[in-house]
Amino acid sequence: KGNNRVVNIAHINDNIRNDSFKDEAFVTKVGLELGINTYIRQLNPKLKSNDESIESWARKERYKLLSEILIESNSNIILTGHHKNDQVETILKNISEKTGLFGLGGMKSVNKNLIRPLLPFTKLELMRIIDKYKIPYVDDSSNDELRFKRNFIRKKVLSPWVLNDNNIVDSIAESGANFSEYQQSLIYFINEFIQKNVSDLQNGQVLIEKKHINKLPSLAKVMVVQVLTNSLGQ
């Protein structure tokens, strides 16, 4: 209430690399030094299904555990450290995976109780602050492994691009923000259509008359389904 905010630290050790315990130890140390409650959780990569990439699996499991910690710590909001470069990498990764219009918007800065406050800042801007105030940090050694698609995009696509155009990160991020606005505008009209033409049935089922859905463009039909199944955005 008011300005009295209680901050907790959460760290998910993905156990994907041999030295991941170093990150865990660093976070634990920072929590102790600052006197902040720290919640550490472990992932078990052996539980990943064979038809799922390690990146997608780890991401899904991280957010799942963060949601559990949110409840356990009696918190209201999850804050993550994603910055503008992460956003651009996400957009390019989504393009490669044919996610369509929704993927072009990238990550949402606010998604229910999940907030990404650092999205407006590039990695370079944040590193300058870290250097200025001598803030300790650790690098994820797996960031150099090109077998991960995001790392390949960062090292082989985005980094050379930045050398040729130092505004490219801002340009792609701004385009992503524009696509996100287009998406929200479309969703507004899709919701109007749903309110007028969709009937709720029992057991989570819905009814849409064929004559109404057939009037919509192909993309709008897809969006109706996505809105109804709550599968929009990240």
Model-derived features: positions:
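AMP-forming adenylation/ATP pyrophosphatase catalytic core
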Residues: K1, N8-I12, L43, L47, ...
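Core alpha/beta nucleotide-donor-binding catalytic domains of modification enzymes
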Residues: K1-S159
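Short, structured loop/turn "capping" segments at alpha-beta junctions
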Residues: P136-V138, N166-I172, L186-Y188
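Internal, active-site/partner-interface "lid" segment
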Residues: N143-N151, V169-S180
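Conserved anion/nucleotide-ligand pocket segment
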Residues: R154-I172
